[in-house]
Amino acid sequence: MLEKNYDAASIEQRIAKKWEARGAFKAGMGSKSAAQSFCVMLPPPNVTGSLHMGHALNTTIQDIVVRFQRMRGKNVLWQPGMDHAGIATQMVVERQLAERQEPTRQEMGREKFVERIWEWRYETGGVIANQLRRLGVSCDWSRERFTMDDGLSEAVREVFVTLYKQGLIYRDKRLVNWDPKLLTAISDLEVEQKEVKGHLWHFRYPLEGKLFDPSDATTFITVATTRPETMLGDTGIAVNPEDDRYRNLIGQNAILPLVGRRLSIVADAYANPDEGSGAVKITPAHDFNDFEVGRRNNLRLINIFTEKAEVFLHENEAFFEGVVLSDALKMLVKDLDQKDRFIARDQIVSLMEEKGYLVTVDDHPHTVPYGDRSGVPIEPFLTDQWYVNAAELAKPAIEAVHQGKTQFIPDSWQKTYFNWMQNIQPWCVSRQLWWGHQIPAWYGPDGRVFVEKSEEEALNSALSHYGEVVNLTRDPDVLDTWFSSALWPFSTLGWPNKTPELATFYPTSLSVTGFDIIFFWVARMMMMGLHFMGEVPFPTVYVHALVRDQKGAKMSKSKGNIIDPLELIDQYSADSLRFTLAIMAAQGRDVKLDPSRIAGYRNFATKLWNATRFAQMNGVKHDPDFKPEKAKLALNRWILTELSKTVVAVTTGIENYKFNESASALYRFIWNTLCDWYLELLKPIFQGSNEDAKNEVQACTAWVLDEVYKLLHPFMPHMTEELWSLTETLGMKREDMLALIQWPEASFSDEEAASDINWLIDAVSAIRSVRFEMNIPAAALAPLVIVEGGELTLKRVELYESLLKKLARVETISFSDKAPALSAQMILGEAIFCLPLGQLIDLEAERARLMKDVSKIEQDIEKLSAKLSNPKFIENAKPEIVEVERNRIVELRTAQKKISLALERLV
């Protein structure tokens, strides 16, 4: 007999250990001979990371699909692993060194520091893998990989060297996102855009050949900027070619204030006539948009910052080129050189104002890019880096999606993919870090580069080139973390070696991802997979939405609304969290996670637990001879028909990645059909003396429960596995753990029996609803009068009269030609069911109560309607508050309709 209460905490831990001891998730487990392979690559979480709600949704979706395919007999591999997370890991270890007052990274040296990181990785890194286990993910943990392990490192070197020798990797001087605190280039994903209350400075730039006069607009052009500190690197001014104000100035020159550099005035659509003054100063070396304008118009690039974002003027040849070194300029250089960029900003603005160049300063809220780890503003910085020719690699990746070789679900993300890929820029793959894949490039004494897989090969290449042995210096930079992640679908399977796993599982079957890394990860896996394997890495990309808080707000530390999945697991169980995420995971719709919903689905799990316990208490046991098609009782044939429909709904939902539809179908069947109706309808049989009927319902119930455990298993794996194990004693030994049992088939249908029982359920539900609406006392037995009932209704009443009376609290059932006066009427198929109300309630008192209720609701609706019609409320209130009020008015109108219907029944 099951315990009275389901103890999720202890059971989930025990079941997880049983799965691992059984090796239930190893590739090939549960598969049939010559089975079709099915492979999913777990997006490798950062080794520094901990489980968040995005992980929980992502891995729950994957696990549902993986468990489903495993139960269908496929040769399944869900490949787990972790990412070395370059910047994040290096920062964690550096912080640890500082806290322990140990030598710094620089004092320790590269080799010892990297050794220290490896120690940290083995001691405390990878906590997230154990957290994922708590969620119940069924990865093949015996194959866990790490992006820095030997095999993957070999793959990284192979790819880098191959691309270099194909001319697809090269070194170039371009703008990058530069973190002046961490002193490295970072990816766009590591940049956080923050809204700041900044300023827009309007400056007068003198026109060449004109005597500057602040009061004479013909002697200058006004430019607007949010970054005065970068003006030292200006090399041009852009105006829109359609802007009549400046058309006559196109092709002329202005003079850079304070410096004296000649600036070309160029026509470029980048300049917006409606923003600022319409004229934009162009600093190609310190702004990404300006870089493109400069490239289109052949403007010089002058870098005026150091790696630490300090002003760099002294010994800056590019800065002095073409300008007269006056005493004023010498003084400027002396005052600003080596100053922090923001200190320099204040000094430059003061000088511009002092010399009459400042027009005005406007308050100007705008976004500023910050490093998400360093917390300092990012600087577009001109530096030498390694780049991948992403545009060339993107061509086949674009074509593959056009041809349908890879599809996005929802398909709206395909447009986003094309937009990114068709406008792709060179991919900066070098990082100024110590932790990561060190770039396999060595430099000769004259700066010539030798790119090889090993130092020995590089020395041999250098010997061939120079004709003598020379010393080589290795490039100190490491590769962008996304470089190794892009190889994940084939490097984890043993590439560049031709392994059986590679032959079996590549291409993989599915990629599940958040929309924020379609470009950073999915697109790059597409490019690398096609280039090195000749096939797309996966035919399907399922893009899930964001998990937001219950009000629909994005979760963030600053808002204090982050929901910790581990706390939810502790409080409600992993299965309850998983089912909640699944049932809310509608395609293209963000998940608004309300803990009360998780509590509700914990109750759902309890409902099934109690149903199984109820079955045990009533002698339910397996009968090896039971076959659905042999069932005789209409109740059993009905539940078997409804079960088959549920099998179809759940299977179709998972196959089409509509997990919410599958979960909803399971919820309806288990809670309503099975527990509320089938088991309730069985009670008279359990309590009766008809042994044949009792034996059949006992065997059928055991069979149906088994099928339910199987269907629910991908969503709630722990509890279903426990129930599967504990119900083994009901007369049948289990052939294996539930995780490895065959998925159910929809093999039964009896629509006549289903129609009859559903009629009974509809009749009972309708009568119960009227009793509730009309406030009929629960103890009162009501007479039921049936009008216009034909042969079908007569037959059904004869078959199910006793059940109808018991469940609907009906005293007598009679047939009549017309409805009794003052009766509540319900239409059921061909007949009208009538409850004479005068015999059951005080009509006048009930009418007064309902009138009072409806009056209060109408007042509330009027107030809310006025509130929602007020533009100021809509404009000033938080969006989630507006949404709450809109939902409230919908609820009130629904209640209003119900009460109005009840009043109509009293007429």
Swiss-Prot record:
One Pfam entry name: tRNA-synt_1
Disulfides per UniProt: none
Subcellular location: Cytoplasm
GO CC annotations on file: cytosol
Alphabetical UniProt keywords: Aminoacyl-tRNA synthetase, ATP-binding, Coiled coil, Cytoplasm, Ligase, Nucleotide-binding, Protein biosynthesis
Superkingdom per UniProt: Bacteria
Coiled-coil spans in chain: 838-870
Gene Ontology biological process terms, A to Z: valyl-tRNA aminoacylation
GO molecular function: aminoacyl-tRNA deacylase activity; ATP binding; valine-tRNA ligase activity
InterPro entries: aa-tRNA-synth_I_CS, aa-tRNA-synth_Ia, Anticodon_Ia_Val, M/V/L/I-tRNA-synth_anticd-bd, Rossmann-like_a/b/a_fold, tRNA-bd_arm, tRNAsynth_Ia_anticodon-bd, Val-tRNA_synth_C_sf
Motif ('KMSKS' region): 554-558
Enzyme Commission code(s) on record: 6.1.1.9
Reactions accelerated catalytically: tRNA(Val) + L-valine + ATP = L-valyl-tRNA(Val) + AMP + diphosphate
Quaternary data: Monomer.
Family note: Belongs to the class-I aminoacyl-tRNA synthetase family. ValS type 1 subfamily.
Function per UniProt: Catalyzes the attachment of valine to tRNA(Val). As ValRS can inadvertently accommodate and process structurally similar amino acids such as threonine, to avoid such errors, it has a 'posttransfer' editing activity that hydrolyzes mischarged Thr-tRNA(Val) in a tRNA-dependent manner.
Protein's UniProt name: Valine--tRNA ligase
Species annotation: Bartonella henselae (strain ATCC 49882 / DSM 28221 / CCUG 30454 / Houston 1) (Rochalimaea henselae)
